[in-house]
């Protein structure tokens, strides 16, 4: 699958909460494996995950690729929303 098809794709948690959209990926260049996806959070997800909404811009989290359950018309995660509370913000 081309990254261009994933870029901007909606991301939904296992409990059907709209988490956000894919905004990037991280690749281990030694093994040529995708290790993380970057998700730009929705305003609702920012609130539910207890992040502080910035005045400008958005919050992106770096989600380990193992959290992805399926990819179709949208990305389905293998965790409920509350299972994402310890995922760090991408810097």
Please provide the spans of the model-predicted regions.
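Peripheral interaction segments used for macromolecular assembly
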Residues: 1-91
